Amino acid sequence: MDKSSIRVLVVEDYEPWRRYFSTALQKQPELQVIGEVSDGLEAVQKAEELQPDLVLLDIGLPTLNGIEAARRIRKVSPASRILFVSENRSADIAEEALSTGASGYLVKSDTGSELLPAVKAVLEGKRFISASLAGHFLVTTALSTTQTVLQWTVILISGMR
């Protein structure tokens, strides 16, 4: 990805947040906000038309929620990376959002300190989770890993009999 021309589509229905995101991103010389939209259907259409490198996507959108919009964007613009920004702190919602193939989930109240690191991480092909949700994901991953190890242990012991 050419660092001098990273193209971003901002999808946010609340105008003050949309303006904040666009302004913060435009201050970065390597980022170019190529579009701003305020609803889910419009997001899908613009993503198909513009093929952005990054879609900054709210969840609570009119006409089509952000999670469904992300699923559709993945189909019409598969190379676009998606970073969710939401007021919702629910780990279940974050998991559902990430299950769409999105690269990150950022809680809006954390954007002051995390917006640019999140964008950078996502553009580098990494995953990003807001610090306020990270604990949940660490516990879930640890439990999942422990369960997998236990399952393999049972299989190995069973095979030894």
Give residue spans per PLM region.
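Conserved acidic carboxylate
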Residues: E12, T153
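Active-site residues of response regulator receiver
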Residues: D58, S86
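Acidic catalytic/metal-coordinating carboxylates
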Residues: D39-E42, N65-E68
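Short amphipathic alpha-helix used as the core "switch/output" element in two-component signaling
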Residues: I67-A79
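Short hydrophobic/Thr-rich beta-strand motif most characteristic of the beta2 strand and flanking loop
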Residues: E30-S38, K46
